[in-house]
């Protein structure tokens, strides 16, 4: 699920320090580029919709989209299972269906009618095992007031929801800060057309957050939802928290979640190893088993480390209830 705001207003402290002799659990990718896949496009449907079929997905577009753009979007869509399957973390936990449906809804009315939540722009429907995307937002996302660039499709929105689809059988076993944060992590790493960049993550995340939470900047500081509040949210509470942010910036919880995932994956080999082991462990558990707690740390400690780390990288943060 991804909520985005729809209106835009006019000495280093090392988080990543590794102990001497520590090595990564597995080699971390520096980049990833999706392999070409076979596509079938049907633009002769009775209801006027466009249908694209690929090895993992069947995408239906309610609005007219050029074949070249459809081909590119399908390449982005297919890149996600390729990436998640090959990633060193045990994230892939595929849907029961071999083909996942994606519906590009023409507007919010169609999106909500199909089962999406009002105010959201992307939605993973776990019951029907399909992805819903608001095409009006996806194809022309809001731009900052002083931007002279033509709006480009928000391919990161596709990546976010399809990460959920790729992890669907594990979502209920993981806290929402991790499932939403990891989806945003891959979304930020996606550079377009199924190409992902995992090096220079500090710059990618910093620049992304400067845009995404620009309206929450006071002076030189960006105001975020506190770490203790985010770590304590249930999946149902997450939806409420996203919908209730002052000023309508539903992205704020995602911003903190993104920083938390970066902390657990790039905050040293020990944190990454614990995260990796936990992800592997939960895949083998029966629904009857009690779910083990996610291996994290004291929230106040993490929050202090985040403030210090990102301040040395050009992102001044204040964690405060809005």
Language-model segments: which ranges?
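Acidic/His/Gly-enriched intrinsically disordered linker/tail segments
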Residues: 45, 122-138, 153, 173-322
